[in-house]
């Protein structure tokens, strides 16, 4: 039997002061022998993916209490990447991941909590809490707020937009053929409900990956925020975490700990899922960071290996008209895992917080088996309500039929894959000695080789101005540098540049490369995470306008076609300059908080984690 961590605050004479404070917070005598379970909520009125979470903590707490635990809720910050996009606010997005990780660790360890339920949803919140869970390694379960419904189809000036989402609105804003009235129509349709944005963007990608890691319940990644079926996920999470506490503390069963659930094979499976579903490139950053926090031997080489082995089985917005509600109708994440498992592409020796084995897991939740269970059929029939709302669990609509078409449906089998390679591809070459990432699922295969003259810009703001002022020409490779974790600092997302290129009709005529990153909503020939970044001496910092840059997805190469002696001369000149490896004439205020982050930030190939001297 393992003593409860909380016993240092609840047991013995020395804990009298702590017990007095616990009593003031509502605990009673009978609570001091029960596990104290932290609920890390991320409710905020700033973010549509979190605006509905205010009362969700009470649902989880009630289930914990009924199962025999003591729930204690606290909140973390949550940044909305879409609202922070396109201005200085985006500098704070990735650093907020570390703030969230640290705040969860601080609260849990300061109060000696025995376990944690992570109520997350949007872009940096799930990764931040995941890093904390791997770091703490106490019983943990994830349950997210769920995706929003897709926007309804609209027709603007005779052009159909079906269905709409956030990216539709951003692209339309840069399209001169869409007038203000038309833009208003798209804007008012794009984001109709609470929940994380409706495509396979970063939030939904990460919430889906927690399923594959085994740390959340089936349906976590795809059950709509507005559907009544999602309430059961919160209730079951509360009951499950108490059971996990009993198994660990009462029966010495350490299989429930995050590092044993999300082990090396689970990370392999999660990234295999990511490749198959065409997830956001941001998942590469976050999975690498989580592995480091948990001391899991998983790195960029593993991701490269998997990208060569795993086919792309699903294309979801922004790469098609499918959205998360369509993924759910097709069986959600268990259906994709089932297709991968039947093809022998998953490790079958993993378990989850809800299942002792992968076979048990899929036998219960994969609707594409010969005998799907009624519980799975009921869950995946959950359909959108079609009503603008910020109220969770407000619809009980059902699909008339499920999408089990493995040839042409939302989720395909391996024999009918979109591409033989995975949705994400790792590129290397003299421009990316430590790696770069491209979302191949978002590009027609005819564009997998692109070569053109560089158009160099020292910031995202300069790039946006150049695009909107029609300074970018077809055939060019737009280079946005000094936007890496240290150089930005904060590694901004380049959603606006990619969306504006698309809106200007250049989405397939230009490429964009950067040491920054991309939104899960980005599309087009977009290469990010170039490592080493410009601020760390990366070759991207030596590109001149007109230099030829070549992207070759088939060969997995990213190269700058400039003679070595010329590059050596440029590097020497840079090193002796007044401000080496800094952007020229960039107007940007960098706060002390961001400077502190930049001083510790590593490049993207290591997940942009902080480099901290070990003082143990």
Swiss-Prot record:
EC number: 4.2.1.9
Pathway(s) per entry: Amino-acid biosynthesis; L-isoleucine biosynthesis; L-isoleucine from 2-oxobutanoate: step 3/4; Amino-acid biosynthesis; L-valine biosynthesis; L-valine from pyruvate: step 3/4
Keyword Hydrolase: no
Enzyme class: lyase
Active-site residues from the entry: 519
Gene3D superfamilies assigned: IlvD/EDD C-terminal domain-like (3.50.30.80)
Secretion signal span: none
PROSITE patterns assigned: ILVD_EDD_1 (PS00886), ILVD_EDD_2 (PS00887)
Cellular component GO terms held in the UniProt record: cytosol
Oligomeric form and interacting partners: Homodimer.
PANTHER family with a match to the protein in the record: D-XYLONATE DEHYDRATASE, D-XYLONATE DEHYDRATASE YAGF-RELATED
Function text: Functions in the biosynthesis of branched-chain amino acids. Catalyzes the dehydration of (2R,3R)-2,3-dihydroxy-3-methylpentanoate (2,3-dihydroxy-3-methylvalerate) into 2-oxo-3-methylpentanoate (2-oxo-3-methylvalerate) and of (2R)-2,3-dihydroxy-3-methylbutanoate (2,3-dihydroxyisovalerate) into 2-oxo-3-methylbutanoate (2-oxoisovalerate), the penultimate precursor to L-isoleucine and L-valine, respectively.
Protein name (database record): Dihydroxy-acid dehydratase
Organism: Corynebacterium kroppenstedtii (strain DSM 44385 / JCM 11950 / CIP 105744 / CCUG 35717)
Gene: ilvD
